[in-house]
Every structure is written in C-alpha cells, then in structure tokens.
C-alpha cells in the first residue's frame, strides 16, 4: 500500500514537461492557464455583446456586480487614473479565480482523461505551479517599476532607492540594500503565497483520494465526507487567494504611483 500510495502521489504531482531542469516548460500549466484566460474572455465578451439597458439576465447581473466591486476597490486604493488599473485588477481576479477553481475538479478525472490520449502526466491547477505564480508576480514587479518611473521620473526612482529611509549620502549603500530587498520581497511573497495555498489544497485533495484506495471500508467511507467538507472550504480558499493577489497588486501599484515620499 505504501509503495502504491507513494507512486500515486508522485504521479499526481508530476508535470507534463518539455525539457529538463530550469529550462523545462510545463505544458499542462501553459494549457490550463490559457484555457482559464479563454473562459474569462468568452464569458465577459459574450455579456458585453448581449448587454441590454432593460432587464438584465442573471449572468449580466453577476458580471456587472463583479465589475462594480473591483472598480470600487481600485477607486478606494489606487490614487491615480483607473483606466488601466481597473481592467488589470478585474483580469487578475477572474483569471486567478478560474485557475484556482480547476482544483475543485476530482483529482483523477483530468489525468485519466489525458491518459486516454497517451498523456501520462498532467497537473491541471496552474496556480499550484511556482513557475506560473512567479511569472505573474514578475509582471507585477515590472509594473511597479513602470508606475514608479511614470509618477516620479527616473531620477525620482533613483532617489527613492538611495535616499530612503535615511536621507543622507552616507547611507546610500544601506538605503539601496534595504529598498532593493523590500522591492524584491513584493513579487516573491506574492508568488509564494498563492502557490503555497494552492499547492497545499491540491495535496490535501490527493491525500483524501488516497483514502479511497485503502483496504479498510471505514477509511474509504470516511473519504467521502472529508472530500465534501474540504471542497466546500476550498471554495473560500480559491476566492480569497484570487482576492489577495488582486488586492496586493493594486496596493503595490498605488504605492509606486504615489508622488509623496514614503
């Protein structure tokens, strides 16, 4: 049982990859990330195309509520033009939420479906892959630099990282180290927070699925309510993690855009 269990867990934690080592490309992560993006674009474009000024349908009401909610958050937290940040925040929340929600699909369904087509390894949750979350966080990192330069100019950027928090030339090396660590900590923490929560959630689903392989009927039966309870709780987790990623992105960009010295 131990060997079978170890192989089962290892199989479910293996990516469909092209290449080896650092340069390996996780094809399953790319596919499901793109699929989540297509779903988001399809739903919102369809609602926009069929939008009516009369009595809206349920889907239009839901989309309008989400858009209004995100726009309100951006308005309250980003003190600058919202024409780019609001759509960005909406895209981040919906895209990350859809990628997270794939974790609610039974752990064996998609791998077994892929196996029918000769694909022996498949991980379906993109946000449980550190390469995906780091990729998104690196994009946020460059946006932070862009909005810092846009707000303060290149000279302001240099000043911020050399004369803060100690406004004296003698502390320039210390200031630079402190501010660089602070800057790099933002995307790293953003990536690992999302990855850690989704990886743990995926692993718990796999461990619960292992219970169905047990020889003990009572243990098999216990897996059903545990699976249901964790799935219900996980709905909160996937929503909260999408919200946190979006919210921290808004806050980081707001800090970068703020013309006042920090």
Curated annotation (Swiss-Prot):
Q: What does this protein do?
A: Key component of the proton channel; it plays a direct role in the translocation of protons across the membrane.
InterPro entries given for it?
ATP_syn_F0_a_bact/chloroplast (IPR045082), ATP_synth_F0_asu (IPR000568), ATP_synth_F0_asu_AS (IPR023011), F0_ATP_A_sf (IPR035908)
Broad class of where this protein is predominantly found = membrane
Instruction: List the GO terms this entry assigns under cellular component, sorted alphabetically.
Output: plasma membrane; proton-transporting ATP synthase complex
The organism's taxonomy opens as:
Bacteria, Pseudomonadati, Pseudomonadota, Gammaproteobacteria, Pasteurellales
- The gene that this protein is the product of is atpB
Q: Mind listing the UniProt keywords for this protein, alphabetically?
A: ATP synthesis, Cell inner membrane, Cell membrane, CF(0), Hydrogen ion transport, Ion transport, Membrane, Transmembrane, Transmembrane helix, Transport
GO BP term, pick one: proton motive force-driven plasma membrane ATP synthesis
Please report the name of this protein according to its UniProt entry.
ATP synthase subunit a
Subunit and partners: F-type ATPases have 2 components, CF(1) - the catalytic core - and CF(0) - the membrane proton channel. CF(1) has five subunits: alpha(3), beta(3), gamma(1), delta(1), epsilon(1). CF(0) has three main subunits: a(1), b(2) and c(9-12). The alpha and beta chains form an alternating ring which encloses part of the gamma chain. CF(1) is attached to CF(0) by a central stalk formed by the gamma and epsilon chains, while a peripheral stalk is formed by the delta and b chains.
Q: Subcellular location, in the record's words?
A: Cell inner membrane
For whether the record's keyword set contains Chaperone, the answer is: no
Residues annotated as transmembrane: 24-44, 84-104, 129-149, 194-214, 228-248
The membrane-topology field of this record reads:
Multi-pass membrane protein
Which terms in the Gene Ontology molecular function aspect does this entry carry? Answer: proton-transporting ATP synthase activity, rotational mechanism
- SUPFAM superfamilies named in the record: F1F0 ATP synthase subunit A
Name the Gene3D superfamilies for this protein: ATP synthase, F0 complex, subunit A
Task: Please state which protein family the record places this protein in.
Answer: Belongs to the ATPase A chain family.
């Amino acid at each position: 049982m131990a060997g079978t269990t170890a192989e089962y867990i290892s199989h479910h934690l293996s990516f469909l990859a092209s290449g080896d080592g650092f340069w390996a490309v996780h094809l399953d992560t790319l596919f499901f990330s793109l699929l989540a993006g297509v779903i988001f674009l399809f739903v919102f474009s369809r609602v926009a195309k069929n939008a009516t000024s009369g009595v809206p349908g349920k889907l239009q009401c839901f989309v309008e509520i989400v858009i209004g909610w995100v726009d309100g958050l951006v308005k309250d937290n980003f003190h600058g033009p919202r024409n780019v940040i609001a759509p960005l925040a909406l895209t981040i929340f919906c895209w990350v939420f859809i990628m997270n929600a794939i974790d609610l699909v039974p752990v064996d369904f998609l791998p077994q479906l892929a196996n029918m087509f000769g694909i022996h390894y498949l991980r379906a949750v993109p946000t449980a892959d550190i390469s995906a979350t780091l990729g998104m966080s690196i994009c946020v990192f460059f946006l932070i630099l862009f909005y810092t330069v846009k707000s303060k100019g290149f000279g302001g950027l240099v000043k911020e990282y050399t004369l803060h928090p100690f406004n004296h030339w003698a502390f320039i090396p210390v200031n630079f180290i402190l501010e660089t660590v602070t800057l790099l900590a933002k995307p790293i923490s953003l990536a690992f927070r999302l990855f850690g929560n989704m990886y743990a959630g995926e692993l718990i689903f796999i461990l619960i699925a292992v219970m169905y392989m047990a020889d003990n009927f009572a243990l098999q039966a216990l897996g059903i309510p545990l699976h249901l309870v964790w799935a219900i709780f996980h709905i909160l987790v996937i929503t909260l993690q999408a919200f946190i990623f979006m919210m921290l992105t808004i806050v980081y960009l707001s800090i970068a855009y703020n013309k006042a010295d920090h």
